[in-house]
Amino acid sequence: MDPYRVRPSSAHDSPFFTTNSGAPVWNNNSSLTVGTRGPILLEDYHLLEKLANFDRERIPERVVHARGASAKGFFEVTHDITQLTSADFLRGPGVQTPVIVRFSTVIHERGSPETLRDPRGFAVKFYTREGNFDLVGNNFPVFFVRDGMKFPDMVHALKPNPKSHIQENWRILDFFSHHPESLHMFSFLFDDLGIPQDYRHMEGAGVNTYMLINKAGKAHYVKFHWKPTCGIKCLSDEEAIRVGGANHSHATKDLYDSIAAGNYPQWNLFVQVMDPAHEDKFDFDPLDVTKIWPEDILPLQPVGRLVLNKNIDNFFNENEQIAFCPALVVPGIHYSDDKLLQTRIFSYADSQRHRLGPNYLQLPVNAPKCAHHNNHHDGFMNFMHRDEEVNYFPSRLDPVRHAEKYPTTPIVCSGNREKCFIGKENNFKQPGERYRSWDSDRQERFVKRFVEALSEPRVTHEIRSIWISYWSQADKSLGQKLATRLNVRPNF
C-alpha cells in the first residue's frame, strides 16, 4: 500500500474517531480512571495526546498584520504590457493566474476590532507558471518611514505600551516627531480614509517601488495600484464605534458573505512607470516610500483585474499559515533600491521562519503550483516526499540543469559605504497638497482628529510645538488651526 495515498488530508478520512496515529478510539467522552471516581491514569494516551495537541494549537502571532481575512480567486490580464515586462503571467490579455489575497489591519492583535483607525494590509499571492509572486502592500500608497532601520522602533511606538499594554498617542507622536517624513502617511491615516468600511471597498497599493524588465533587458521603475470596482467607502468615527460595537469581525464577515452570495469583489490593477533615466527630473526621490508619484505626469496604466470568487476552506491553514514575502518575485519583475523594500526582503521571510518553521514554503497555501526543484531539504516539519540520491549540484548523474537565463538589467553600484539620509527629502510638499485638495468639511474632520491626538495629557508642549511646526510647513493655515485649538503659539 502506498502510505502517501492516504495521508491525512482531511479530518473525515475515517468513519470513526482515531488517535493521530490512526488507532481507533472507542470512547472520546471519558478519561481512564481507577474506578468510577478514582484518579486519572497516565496510560490514557488518547487523553494526553488530546490535551497536548490542544496546548499547541496556537502559533506565534504575526508581529504586524495579525488580524486578517483571506479569499481566493484569479487575476486576469486585460491590457498588453509586454513592452514593459517579460513576466510570464502578464504575457497577454486573457491570461489568468490563480491568486489568494489576505486583507488585514496592521498594528492591532488577532481578534481586535476591524473598525480601528489603522492602515490595512492588501497582500496578493500570484501562483504563476514561473513561481509565486507576492505583491505585499497596504491600502495607502505611502508609508511612515523611508528606511527599514527605523521599522522595529516604529512598530514598538505604534504597539501598546509595554508596561500597560495600552496603545497611547503620546508614544506615537513622540516617536514620529523625530521623523517628519511620516506627515504624508498621517495625512492618509487621520483622513476619512483612515477607517475603511470593509475590505471590498478599499484601494490597495504595492507601496514600494519595484522594477519591470522587458525581454530586451530594459528596466522601468514601477508602482502598483489596486482600484475597487465597487468604489471606496469609509466609516466615520461615529459609525466605526457603532459597527465595531455590534460586530468586531464585520469586515471579515462582509468579505465571506459577499463571496458566498456570488457578489464577487473585484479590483483593477494599474501601474505607474518611470524611466530611471528621468528620476532626477522630480523634486522627490522615486525610491522614497513616503512619496506618491504624480498621476498627471506618470499616469495610471491599466493591466488587469483581480476577482475573488472562492472563500478559503480553512481559516488556520489559509489565513494564519499563509506567508507573504516581498522577496518572492518572478522573471520580469525585480526589486529597486528602495531602502524599505530592501529590508522587507529579509525581514518578512525571517518572520515566517520564526512563526511557521524553516519549511513554511512547503505548506500547501505557500507552495508554488508549478514544478520546482532544489537541494533544500530536511529541517523541522519537512514533509516533502523525496527519494533522490543526489542532493548536490552539479552532478553528472542528475539531469537537472540551470534554467535559461532570463532578461536582467545591468546595474552599476559605486560610491562610499555610508549611512545617510536621502538627498531629496521634501517632507512637507505632498502632505500639504493633499490637505489643500480636500473640501472644508474634510479638512475640519482631519484637524479635529489631530487636535484630539495632540491633546492627550502626556503629549508634552515640546512635542505639540514640533507637530504644529511640521504641519505649518505643509500648510500654514493648517498649522494655525492646530495652534489656535491647542493654545500653542506657532513658531513659523
From Swiss-Prot:
Q: Which UniProt keywords apply?
A: Cytoplasm, Heme, Hydrogen peroxide, Iron, Metal-binding, Oxidoreductase, Peroxidase
What Gene Ontology cellular-component terms does the record carry?
A: chloroplast envelope; cytosol; cytosolic ribosome; mitochondrion; nucleus; peroxisome; plant-type cell wall
Residues annotated as binding heme:
Y348
Catalytic center residues:
H65, N138
Tell me where in or outside the cell this protein is found: Cytoplasm
Family, similarity comment: Belongs to the catalase family.
Protein name listed in UniProt: Catalase-1
